[in-house]
């Protein structure tokens, strides 16, 4: 491989970290100050809604950061409002799927974004919105760029499922998206593609997308002209907390803040992946960025009086054991009876299995008609570290088992059993496999929050015959060149460690209908329209 190609790949990989929400440098210490005139509520007399989405924010480390005085802005908003430590995320617990749920108010069966990595039966290829460097070096870099930046929002995200930006536009209201990886709206924008990518002749110099009225996306689109300082390579091309904060503050200071602003702070996720879920540095940096946004109002008191603040995580993380051999569960040896497709070449007619690993969960596809999903499940059951193994039959029943057990649990939507969110189900078999308890036809969830609806969402998220598998806490699933986080943190599974996130609400006494990310969109629309 020539040096020029190596440099290009390195740069493209840097841009692909946009989706992963990885670490960027940010040396500025941000302190509370009163330097700008206060901003009042919008022309209709209603408070604008500002959503701060902090990647991999979790309750326990947040509480610890507050106790140590390292998160004063979040502490201030918490003290001025409401705090909910355990809000249920989407599944898989990967940012692209969760953000699609946040924006559409649906699970993956309706929004059709299955995970960070999945296989398209229609295109006969893997879809990667970004992933580890080893994995990415084996695939088409420019295709990953196109999938992550364009296809995700304009093609893969179900057009029949409206985003919050689209619904607001339909009502004549405005919104903003700042560094959010899912942003589809109704206003056309031209994303400026870096020259080293546009020169490939496969990617246009300007990429036309639809988003909200105000769209900011790292080096590809900025609101604040001075924010170029935060877009160099070593700052992940602008996919960092400081960039997000500066663009949000710019809207406030210029009195252009729309009805709803969704701002994404990515850096905590990478620090949690590397240092483990108990690290506090990422929370401290996110809080410093939040201070920048609050300061744009002149004072924090003015900020709370003149806006509704929603600060939340998207997924949790589970600590990964620090011994590589013990911590990783390689799926390939379990399925060595089959011909498994290779990452670095197109799927061949003789291939039988495709593996799409998403950290602590994976989709395992049977792409050959002679492969029975039930046989794939039996081979997977030989690994006792596998937590949930699920497949769907021809009648849309979902069957669940796990490693080293002969137990089986089956279910489908509709029926006499009602869960704590008002959803109805038909159940049979060993309920302890999904840790639910049933009493008088009422379902209570255990360590897998909202497991029936979330798993059903993934099992019906896209075309194809596939098995969904998750791994127990402490472990990660790997396929060919999958990224690992040995001694750090990982997410992706249905387990509560991956699935529960905190929510801070300030500026309103209301809350979502249920404490699930899937219900936050409708609540925000109510706040804007009431």
Locate predicted features:
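Bacterial N-terminal signal peptides that target proteins for export
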Residues: 2-10
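C-terminal motif of bacterial Sec signal peptides marking the signal peptidase cleavage site
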Residues: 18-21
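Active-site-proximal N-terminal segment of extracellular/periplasmic enzymes that hydrolyze or transfer
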Residues: 24-82, 93
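His/Asp/Glu-rich, glycine-adjacent segments
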Residues: 26-27, 106-107, 112-273, 429, ...
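Short, structured active-site-proximal loop/turn typified by the sulfatase FGly-forming signature C/S-X-P-X-R
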Residues: 63-117, 174-176
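Active-site neighborhoods of enzymes that stabilize oxyanions during catalysis
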Residues: 160-161, 350-511, 517, 521
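A long, amphipathic alpha-helix that forms part
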Residues: 238-252, 259-261, 268-309, 319, ...
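Acidic/histidine-rich catalytic neighborhood
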Residues: 304-305, 313-366
